[in-house]
């Protein structure tokens, strides 16, 4: 009994939040992108970012582990391989959402290689890529494979893509789908657009669609690398209330989007705002949104948590 109690005390002190949205890049990728892109000097996407750079943030915010999300071009599978190596080597990382071209004939070659690592949790599509895949026979074959394998599709999209989300959900009803950053919501003059409100309700009606309550700073009207985003919970209620009322506590997933969210203010604010919103709803809701939903939805293995 004493041993069990001691174990529980140790466990209680561990970081407890799962952060299923961060970005990391290695030297080779940054050197390549320096020849193809022009980043703001303070943009984290233009810098080498490794797991140890995240450790202080994770410890401070009680983030137990992070699921990394792609930040690379479709035709650079070697950058997926780099991230997967980081996941294997770092106790902070518990999985990866990769980048790929589902219309490509070599998709399955790379997919099988990623799977063999044991750290692949799914793929992310960006904007109009989703519509392209829905209209491509080979991509649809690959989507059916991902559905059978229980993998997740992350979507970096906006409200204008809502119909495509519905089509994906209905055509592949067992596919696990998650909308990133509340459709990249923007609060203008204290509210969100009617188009966004409709998109949230339309997509939430599909039961295999989840939503990340993530990157809260980016919802503000401030420009990146200028003044910090507001810290008052009330400012963010137009977004938070809309997604909570539509998706409910069991289909929302917290995430920081570090370090992009830091372009608009402190990453601490992302957690603080979401926690301030969830706490009055009870500990069960807090636990669901802050870690349980991510663990279940992404099939994160506990043995990979620090």
Annotated model-derived regions:
Residues 1-8:
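Bacterial N-terminal signal peptides
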Residues 9-20, 29-31, 35-61, 65, ...:
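Mid-to-C-terminal alpha-helical segments outside catalytic/metal-binding sites
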Residues 14-16, 62-67, 90-95, 117-121, ...:
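Short, well-ordered coil/turn segments that N-cap beta-strands
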Residues 21, 83, 96, 146, ...:
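Conserved, mostly hydrophobic/aromatic
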Residues 37-74, 93-100, 121-128, 151-153:
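Divalent metal-dependent hydrolysis catalytic cores, especially in the metallo-beta-lactamase
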Residues 46-55, 78-82, 106-110, 162-165, ...:
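Alpha-helical scaffolding within the catalytic cores
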Residues 74-160, 167-169, 183-184:
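Active-site gating/metal-coordination segments in enzymes
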Residues 133-253:
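Catalytic pocket-lining loop regions of alpha/beta-barrel enzymes
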